[in-house]
Amino acid sequence: MTHLLSFIAFCSISLFVGAQPLDNWEADKIKVTQASGVQTIMHAEALFEDRWDQLPQAQFWKKIMLLSPDSCLINVAANRQILDQMAIRDWNAQTEAQKDSTRQAYREANGLPSDTRIYVTTGKNDFYRFTEVYPSLDKGVAAFERYGVDPWYAQSILLIESPALMRKSSTGAYGAFQLMPGVARSMGLVVNSTTDERKDFERSAYGAAQLIRRVCIPEAKRILEKHQLSYNETDLWFRLFVLHVYHAGALNVAAVVDKIQPTEGSQELIKAMWQNSAAGFGNNSQNYTQLALAAQLILHDMVYQNCTEISPCLSR
């Protein structure tokens, strides 16, 4: 995974932006009591306000994250509409010609144009281990708050990157927040042949928080202001936009926004980013915030199914 490779040199420039007050996110937090103890996490109310939870992309990835890798979903590439579910062994048993015929049969059965791209996506519950990741959310939320950074980002990144596995990606990203080595160094972490602070949760959280505070949020604002788009930093669409910068890099996000030429900042901008590519902003970049939405939905369900008590951190 590539986090702002094009900004490693840029990161050496001082980009300190005034941090928000540490109590600014109290209204977004909840205390969840379970048999294992009490955890403070971010609530998911914003997902339901503008019906983000009903978007087919969010529903698709939610199902994929919970689905075993021995199964797959047949889906429309453009909007992730689910057409069918089947065993992956049955799909793989077909010849390429048979697979093409099967795709065409799905198009005809669902009234889709003949050139509609049909994807076959396998389940990924072997990677997304939410029960194992859950204990780290409280630590991530607390760490980001200490550094004056919206803890929603900590929760989202931890859910997506699944730190329970602690794998190094093919591009070199590592640690709970999947930081690239050059980016980690530019944010103050030691990464060399003998020491890699990315494997330490607290140091990795520090590096990710600094990256978001010093680069991602300022660059997101710059891109939006270039297009004269207004924003509120606690709006869900803005947070998702910042996540795109975190994952794909500001230059790539700027390129896709230039292509879209949006007239307002809203859910529609995020949905347009899911449908467009430019520079290095491709399929993986499009998927990143879809995964974030799906992961938050799964967390919401998991918390409400397993908790004994939920209380707001700020009285309303």
Regions found by a protein language model. Give the residues of each.
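Substrate-binding/active-site groove segments that recognize
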Residues: 172-193, 204-216, 267
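Cell-wall glycan-active module
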Residues: 3-5, 10, 15-159, 167, ...
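Peptidyl-prolyl cis-trans isomerase
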Residues: 253
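Active-site microenvironments of hydrolase-like enzyme catalytic domains
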Residues: 238
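Cell-wall polysaccharide-cleaving catalytic domain and substrate-binding groove, primarily
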Residues: 160-176, 183, 249
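Active-site metal-coordination segments of metallo-dependent hydrolases
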Residues: 129-130, 194-205, 279
